[in-house]
């Protein structure tokens, strides 16, 4: 077990509501984290969220809150006190579950070999911040288990744990979305080509594996996940997020379909307001394509 078990949440482009922050802290406590690191590139958004209340809530759960800037984060690497790994939520739309799992295994082994005192799970934002919070859950859950349980955590039943966290049978659906980036073999480190297609209209022509047949296959799986998750949307905000993640992937497969894009733009605002303060929403929405 690592002495320090930390989760870093990037608040540079979007800031969670107090309710969301408390829900996240509850999840961290459940998976034996003892350090919560709100991150900002420079100044912290003091006017948007009460860090005093967050710190007090962390303390109630046996967690230390440590504000972290870019300089602080880089200093962690210089001191090499932590084995660091990403949730792989950024630049993904719906996650990169297998890449995340492999990184967890490597980070735990390397941290143990050099006797690192901490295990740090990072959850950075990308320039678009379209992905819903649920996309980070597999990394948070698995990271907590690796930090406290070591290498044997690679065999954990992640789907079952996600069902418990979301209090609904959504874990398998979320993991299914989180493996679609592997289709067609167009794999990049720390990025999904489906994200590239939606955000920059690139990827399709550069990767022969991403044929229209493959994109149609991804779209079909995403629609199936959406239909299954929709049965729970009246009872679970997590289900709403899973539906939205599925729709993002579907839009990436049909990037020039204005009807799909209009629907996901409408959904974007609703999902954002579930979890985050209003600031940043317009900037994120503006990056979704229009035709």
Give the positions of each predicted feature.
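Substrate-binding groove of N-acetylhexosamine-processing glycoside hydrolases
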Residues: 56, 61-62, 75-291
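Feature activates predominantly on carbohydrate-active enzymes
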Residues: 1-82
């Amino acid at each position: 077990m690592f002495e320090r078990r930390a989760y870093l949440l990037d608040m540079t482009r979007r800031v969670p509501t107090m309710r969301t922050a408390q829900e996240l802290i509850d999840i961290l406590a459940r998976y034996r984290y003892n350090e919560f690191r709100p991150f900002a590139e420079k100044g912290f958004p003091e006017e948007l969220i009460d860090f005093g209340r967050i710190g007090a809530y962390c303390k109630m759960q046996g967690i230390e809150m440590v504000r972290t800037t870019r300089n602080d984060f880089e200093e962690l690497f210089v001191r090499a006190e932590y084995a660091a790994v990403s949730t792989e939520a950024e630049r993904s739309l719906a996650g990169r579950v297998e890449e995340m799992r492999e990184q967890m295994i490597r980070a735990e082994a390397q941290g143990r070999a050099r006797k690192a005192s901490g295990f740090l799970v990072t959850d950075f934002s990308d320039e678009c911040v379209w992905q819903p919070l649920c996309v980070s859950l597999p990394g948070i859950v698995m990271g907590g288990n690796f930090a406290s349980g070591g290498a044997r955590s690679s065999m954990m039943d992640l789907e079952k744990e996600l069902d418990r966290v979301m209090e609904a049978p959504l874990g398998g659906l979320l993991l299914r979305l989180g493996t679609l980036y592997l289709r067609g073999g167009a794999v990049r480190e720390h990025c999904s080509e489906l994200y590239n297609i939606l955000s920059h209209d690139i990827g399709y022509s550069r990767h022969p594996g991403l044929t229209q047949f493959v994109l149609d296959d991804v779209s079909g799986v995403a629609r199936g996940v959406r239909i299954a998750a929709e049965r729970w949307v009246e009872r679970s905000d997590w289900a709403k997020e899973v539906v939205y993640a599925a729709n993002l992937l579907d839009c990436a497969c049909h990037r020039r379909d204005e009807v799909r894009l209009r629907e996901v733009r409408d959904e974007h605002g609703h999902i954002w307001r579930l979890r985050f303060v209003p600031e940043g929403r317009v900037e994120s929405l503006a990056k979704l394509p229009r035709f």
